[in-house]
Amino acid sequence: MYEYIRGQFQGISKDYVVIELNNIGYKIFTSGNTMSNMPKVGEEVLLYLEQIVREDFIGLYGFTTREELEMFKLLLSINGVGAKAALSLLSISTVNNLKYAIMMGDEKHITRAPGIGKKTAQRIILELKDKLKPDELTSEEGELIEGINDNSDYSFNINETLSALMALGYTEKEAQKALEKVDKTLSIENMIKESLKLLMR
């Protein structure tokens, strides 16, 4: 079992990042939040890990904070919520805002995550509401729940940008290379524009 990995950030894709350690590139699935916190290519980064092993799959999932890792594991404990859904939930806002939404029973916020329907949102609230502690959140963090911008879904924006660039005739590798140099907090439209500037040089 892995605790964490410290290595060089080498790239980003639709739902994972690549970390190089001892000349080996590790494919690590992650959330939009963690993707947005990646350094420049070649710089060092530390990710806290969880390994998932199934009959047909072995994967590493990593996050820049222990808090996000623990929330990921908590979401996986819910029947019907897999790794993909958990990452989707962790991509729509900060961990604290997700916790706040669960404690407040805010189904609308939770169903913003791609792949999460009303029934799943209700199950998440029912099973986790009593496990989360209100004193873990400040009032300021709680207030943020009303002002979350759609652009906080980093992984969704990255996917859409990559798809748009590939639709324009660029290869996935070319699109990814350009996107690595673009600010991930921009809107999809602006990420496409900035990526095209790099690709047309």
Curated annotation (Swiss-Prot):
Classification via SUPFAM superfamilies: DNA helicase RuvA subunit, C-terminal domain, Nucleic acid-binding proteins, RuvA domain 2-like
Keyword annotations from UniProtKB, A to Z: Cytoplasm, DNA damage, DNA recombination, DNA repair, DNA-binding
InterPro entries: DNA_helicase_Holl-junc_RuvA_I (IPR013849), Hlx-hairpin-Hlx_DNA-bd_motif (IPR003583), NA-bd_OB-fold (IPR012340), RuvA (IPR000085), RuvA_2-like (IPR010994), RuvA_C (IPR011114), RuvA_C_sf (IPR036267)
Compartment(s): Cytoplasm
Region described as Domain III: 153-201
One Pfam family from the record: RuvA_N
HAMAP family per record: DNA_HJ_migration_RuvA (MF_00031)
Protein role: The RuvA-RuvB-RuvC complex processes Holliday junction (HJ) DNA during genetic recombination and DNA repair, while the RuvA-RuvB complex plays an important role in the rescue of blocked DNA replication forks via replication fork reversal (RFR). RuvA specifically binds to HJ cruciform DNA, conferring on it an open structure. The RuvB hexamer acts as an ATP-dependent pump, pulling dsDNA into and through the RuvAB complex. HJ branch migration allows RuvC to scan DNA until it finds its consensus sequence, where it cleaves and resolves the cruciform DNA.
Name this protein carries in UniProt: Holliday junction branch migration complex subunit RuvA
Protein's organism: Clostridium perfringens (strain ATCC 13124 / DSM 756 / JCM 1290 / NCIMB 6125 / NCTC 8237 / Type A)
Gene this chain is encoded by: ruvA
